[in-house]
Amino acid sequence: MSAFVYMLRCKDDSLYTGWTNNLEHRLAMHKAGKGAKYTRGRGPLTLAYVEELSDQESALKREYAIKQLPRSMKLKLCSSWQKQNTEK
């Protein structure tokens, strides 16, 4: 079963990183204010990055790795992802 690592850009321009098995459902939860405590009250939220991985373990490891990156590297990941997804 695949899993996803994602980043959300919050209204205050901060980035939230998380993982899920069901991306659409998780995004709906965040937008409804029922996601992570960090994102509550920081809307509107926009999807800034998504990476699909083969399983939960891989997603958790990747989420941790992304969270360790400096903000500048996170922004580069987001920029690269957005370029790839606007060209399609």
Model feature map: region roles:
Residues 1-74, 78-88:
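GIY-YIG nuclease catalytic motif and its immediate N-terminal context
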